[in-house]
Amino acid sequence: MESYKINLGGALLGEDLEYREEINIEYDIEKETITHIGKGFDKDGIDLRNFIAVPPLVNSHTHTADFTFPEIGVDKPLKDLVGDPKSEKYRYFEIYQNKISEGIRNFLINSKNIGVFTVVDFREQGIKGVKLGIEASSGIRDFNHILLGRLDTFSIDELRELYNSAHGYGLPSISSNSIPELIDIRRVFSDKIRAAHVSETKKHYLRHDLEQLISYYKPTLLIHGTNLSKNDFSLIREIPLVICPRSNLWFSVGIPKIADAIEEGVELLFGTDNGAWIDYNLWKEIEVALLISRSQKPLSNFAKQILKGATITAYKVFKLNYGIEESRKFLIVLLKKEELVRAHDIYTAIVKRGSNLVTYSLGATQNLK
C-alpha cells in the first residue's frame, strides 16, 4: 500500500464534525481513502500545520446553465424569468445555445475551487439538457455532478429515456404537470431522486402545493419551502429540504423560516439556486442562513447545524462517501488556520469566515510530495 501522511493544525472529524487540533492523517493513494487519523504530528507527514481541514461542501440545488448569462432581467419578477419554455431563461438558452455547456462547466470548476465537490443541478431542456450537463462535467476529477432532468413537454417515452440518463427528476412546480403525469413521473423514477420546488412563492403555497406533491409525486427532496409554516415542517421531517435564502431575498418571494425548520427537526440542506442571479459560492449561502436564523431567534447559534447541512446531512441524502474519518474518501478542504484558531466558536467562525479562508482542496489523486 502506497500512502502519504499529512500534518494538520486542526480538522472537523466524523459525523458530528468534532473539532480536534494538531492531528495527522494517513491515506491510501490507490484506494483514495483515509486509513488512519492520529493525534499529534507525524515526523514523516507533509507539513500543513497552518491549515484547518473541513469536509467538502455540497451545493444541493442549482440551475447551473443560467451562469452562462448572469444578471439578465434584473427588473423582472421571478415568473417572467424562470419556468416554462416561454420565460426569459429559455429565450437566453436559444441565444447562448453554443455557450451553455461552457457556462455549466465554469460553474462547476469555480465551485470546486472553493471546496464544493458536489453540485445538484436542476437541468432544463429535457434529455438534451441532461446530455449537456454530462458533457460539461466530463473530466472534472473528484467531482460529483448530480443531474436532475425534466421534460418541457410530457411524453412517457421521453420520460423513460430521461430516466436512463439522469440521476433523478427535478419538478419545477406542482402546476408544471397534471396529476396523472405526476404519478407517471413517480413510477418511472421510483428508485431515483424525485425533487420538486415547493412553496417558493406565496401563490404556490396558497394552492396547497405541499400537500399535492406529497400525495401524487411523493418527493424525496424538496426545494425552497420559503413560505412553509412551522406546522408544515412537521409534515416533511422525513423529506430533506434545500433552502436557498439568497435567491429568495433577490426575487422578493419571502424569507425561509430557518430557525423553525431546525427546531422542528427538518433535514436542512443548502443551495445557491439560479446561477444567473446568485453566484456559486455556497459559503455565502450558509453565512446568510446563519444570519437569518439568528434574526428569527435572537441570540441563537445554529452554526453547527447549518454547517452539517452543507456537509454531513447532504452526504447521507446523496449517498456520498465524504467526511474526515477512516475509510472515507480522502477529500478535504483547507482553510487558513490563523484567523480561525483565535475564534471562540469554531463553527460560527467557519460559517461566517470560511468563504475568505479557503486555500485549496486536496484529493488522493494529487501529488503532495
Report each predicted region and the residues it spans.
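C-terminal cap of metal-dependent C-N hydrolases
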Residues: 316, 326-369
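Alpha-helical scaffold segments that flank or form the walls of functional sites
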Residues: 26, 52-53, 70-141
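Divalent metal-coordination and catalytic microenvironments
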Residues: 9, 25, 32, 50, ...
